[in-house]
Each structure stands twice: as structure tokens, then as C-alpha cells.
């Protein structure tokens, strides 16, 4: 059976514009909170294929999105590379021993060995594929090497990225060595996700905006393109979505390139600009400001504006970043319904 989401990713004509939401399997859903409480904590939920499968399917069943996205976390990669991930309540993810030297890099587990330890992810994918409706697609994902490296070097989330940037400008070779090692793991990780059954790949560069535009290609984009090239060489029919958040200047200068299918547009980048610069080359995904979900009227206004720009061609509806935990479920449903309405779903 044809999957409308996969067709849309490949730029094919579809009867309406499909929609999903970043972080759609998450805290705004009471059903998710119940399963998370049963799991004990966030990491336990990631490591439990049965429960991770359940929360992956929830937004498809409850909200009506056209694709499921695997429930996991980008930081399971450095965790299995040997970095000892923990989640501290109220503070987020932490690594107890951040990378400071080449010796730290050399100690990390690399390549296929690290990717091979993520069996719980592949088991989750297989379970989801058994239970997901045939007309719905499953999105697998990874963090971009730069975004992963920020946590590995800083030891936690950061607003300034000063430790990473100090390395970028004072010891770029060390940073490139970290990025290269992470890139190799990501290649094998995404290959194994595809082999397990995902239909589409998304690469999240959540902290792309931390890099000045003139350095973005060198320290992030080229590594994302390397991953896409590797996957396309083996799985040419598997669509790849790139989502670098907060790089309008990079887009405006015409610096985006690479062998991928869909460009995810964040809410801070005008859709008209993305269409002008990228619309002929890539399908565009996005880009409603997530806080509009607090108001059904604001949601409808934005959905109609995006539809006016894109005209239902070479487009996938999404938010311009993740859905927030206190959004009413009814408003999330309204967003999905409005995306379907304006694009002509019967």
C-alpha cells in the first residue's frame, strides 16, 4: 500500500498534504504520561521496546498524524559510545565525563560496534512496524553530529556553547575528530534503523544556530551531507529529511546542498524564503510556530498562510520545532485537521 507521507517526501503528487509534529509522542498526551510513569523514567522508556512502541503509536491513533516518529532520544548514541548518560529532573541530560582531549575521543566506542549496541531501538522499530497501519509511515531519526557533540563536549545542555566554541576556534582539529567519530556511528545507526524497517530518515540539527553562518558548513552541514550520501548509496529509495534549526542566513546565501529529499524549515525562517531558495531542489517541511498551538484561531491563520505560500506542492506540514508539553490535545488535533482541510483531504 502506498504511504502518502513517503510519496510526499519524494516529491510525488499526493491527494492532500500530509502532516506530523516534532515531539508528537510526548508530554502533552496524558496517555504518554501514564506509560512514562509506568516506565519509571525517560531512559527506561527509551530502553523498553514494548513501551516505546506504545508511545510511538499514540499520536497516530489519538491526533491523526500521517506518520509516526520512533520514540527514542538523540543522546542514546553517545551513551552507547561509552559516555554514561543520565537525566536529572529539572536539569535535563548530563554526561558525567565530557570530552576534553584526544585521549577522551580515543576511548569512545566507534562505528559499527557502538551502533550494534542500540538493539533496543531496532527492536522497537520492528514492533512498531508490526502494529502501524499500512498507510502510515515510520520516521527514524538521529541527531546531527554537531548537535550530539555539543552535549558530549559541554556535558549537558547549554545556552552559550562556549566550551564547544572555544574548541572550534582554538583546537578545530580536535572538534573535527569528535565530529568524524560521531558521524561514523550515525551512519551505521541509521543503516540499522532502515534495515529494521523505518520508511524515512530525519536528521535533527537542533543547535545549528549556535554556529556562525560562515562556519556552519565546515562544522555541521558537511557531516550531515556525508551521512545522507552514505545512506543514499545503499538505500536510494529511502527519503531523508534534514532539519537544521535556526540557519536563515545559510539558506538566504544559497549555501544548502546535498543528496537528500526534504528540508525542514524552522519557524524563524520565512516559508517564502525557503521556497524561493530551496523549493525547486527539495520538498519543504514545516513550519508553524509551536506556540500557535495554544490558540485554534492562530493555528488556522498560520496553516492557511503556509498553504497559500506552498500551494499544496512539494510540501509536508509540520511545526517549526517541537510541540510543547502544555498544549491541549484538542488543539493538536485541530492543527492536524486544519492541515488536511486546507490541502483538500476528502
Swiss-Prot record:
GO terms for biological process: protoporphyrinogen IX biosynthetic process from glutamate. It catalyses: uroporphyrinogen III + 4 H(+) = coproporphyrinogen III + 4 CO2. GO terms for molecular function: uroporphyrinogen decarboxylase activity. It is found in: Cytoplasm. Substrate binds at residues 23-27, 73, 151, 206, 321. Its main location: cytoplasm. InterPro entries: UROD/MetE-like_sf, Uroporphyrinogen_deCO2ase_HemE, Uroporphyrinogen_deCOase. GO terms for cellular component: cytosol. It comes from the Bacteria. Pfam families: URO-D. The record marks 73 as: Transition state stabilizer. Homodimer. Belongs to the uroporphyrinogen decarboxylase family. PANTHER family: METHYLTETRAHYDROFOLATE:HOMOCYSTEINE METHYLTRANSFERASE RELATED (PTHR21091), UROPORPHYRINOGEN DECARBOXYLASE (PTHR21091:SF169). This is Uroporphyrinogen decarboxylase. It comes from Sulfurovum sp. (strain NBC37-1). The gene is hemE.
Amino acid at each position: 500500500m502506498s504511504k502518502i507521507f513517503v510519496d510526499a517526501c519524494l516529491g510525488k503528487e499526493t491527494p492532500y498534504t500530509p502532516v506530523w509534529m516534532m515531539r508528537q509522542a510526548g508530554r502533552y498526551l496524558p496517555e504518554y504520561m501514564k506509560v512514562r510513569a509506568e516506565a519509571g523514567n525517560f531512559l527506561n522508556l527509551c530502553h523498553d521496546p514494548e513501551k516505546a512502541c506504545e508511545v510511538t503509536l499514540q499520536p497516530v491513533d489519538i491526533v491523526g498524524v500521517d506518520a509516526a516518529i520512533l520514540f527514542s532520544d538523540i543522546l542514546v548514541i553517545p551513551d552507547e559510545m561509552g559516555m554514561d548518560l543520565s537525566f536529572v529532573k529539572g536539569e535535563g541530560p548530563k554526561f558525567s565525563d565530557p570530552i576534553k582531549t584526544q585521549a577522551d575521543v580515543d576511548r569512545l566506542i566507534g562505528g559499527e560496534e557502538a551502533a550494534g549496541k542500540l538493539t533496543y531501538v531496532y527492536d522497537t522499530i520492528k514492533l512498531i512496524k508490526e502494529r502501524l497501519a499500512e498507510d502510515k509511515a515510520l520516521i527514524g531519526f538521529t541527531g546531527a553530529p554537531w548537535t550530539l557533540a555539543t552535549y558530549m563536549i559541554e556535558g549537558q545542555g547549554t545556552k552559550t556553547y562556549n566550551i564547544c566554541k572555544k574548541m572550534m576556534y582554538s583546537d578545530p582539529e580536535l572538534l573535527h575528530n569528535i565530529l568524524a567519530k560521531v558521524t561514523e556511528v550515525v551512519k551505521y545507526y541509521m543503516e540499522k534503523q532502515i534495515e529494521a524497517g523505518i520508511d524515512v530518515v530525519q536528521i535533527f540539527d537542533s543547535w545549528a544556530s549556535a554556529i556562525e553562518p560562515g562556519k556552519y558548513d565546515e562544522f555541521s552541514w558537511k557531516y550531515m551531507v556525508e551521512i545522507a550520501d552514505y545512506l543514499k548509496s545503499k538505500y536510494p529509495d529511502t527519503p531523508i529529511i534534514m532539519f537544521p534549526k535556526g540557519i536563515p542566513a545559510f539558506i538566504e546565501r544559497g549555501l544548502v546542498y546535498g543528496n537528500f529529499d526534504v528540508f525542514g524549515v524552522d519557524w524563524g525562517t520565512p516559508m517564502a524564503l525557503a521556497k524561493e531558495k530551496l523549493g525547486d531542489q527539495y520538498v519543504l517541511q514545516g513550519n508553524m510556530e509551536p506556540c500557535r498551538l495554544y490558540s485554534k484561531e492562530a493555528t488556522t491563520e498560520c496553516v492557511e498562510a503556509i498553504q497559500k505560500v506552498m500551494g499544496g506542492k512539494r510540501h509536508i506540514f509540520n511545526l517549526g520545532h517541537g510541540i510543547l508539553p502544555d498544549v491541549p490535545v484538542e488543539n493538536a488535533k485541530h492543527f492536524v485537521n486544519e492541515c488536511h482541510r486546507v490541502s483538500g483531504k476528502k
